[in-house]
Amino acid sequence: MSQEFKISKELASLIDNVVKKFPSNRKRSAVIESLLILQHDNHGYVTKDIIKALSNYLSVSEIDIYEVATFYTMINVAPVGKNVIAVCNNVSCMLRGSDEILTHIEQKLKIKVGESTSDNKFYLKDEIECLAACNGGPMMQIN
């Protein structure tokens, strides 16, 4: 049986600094940045227990926080390797060879998209739509 996740005083202080940026009735505006803080503290991903703790802390529904966590690609809801590799799969990058780069990475690291290497050093992230540098594509991001 796992223990319930509790937000530490240090993490609460960081989250409080985020919350202060917004009107008092807009705590939900702090969800993305708060998830990133908690993710950083939890080896690169958030769990259901973390989402529940943040829900209680911000008084925002769990489902609202879960929807944010699963919508934004920079938030991981499953364990990932130490270094996260993301290859853009948008049209401009695809036309310039992102598929070939992705295939090369898969072969070199012996993993598929959505997997980590056996030593947990690398995780190949899935579905990155745009890294906002289309003129320099194909683009990829590490960490």
Description of each model-found segment:
Residues M1-N143:
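Signature of N-terminal electron-transfer/Fe-S-associated modules in redox systems
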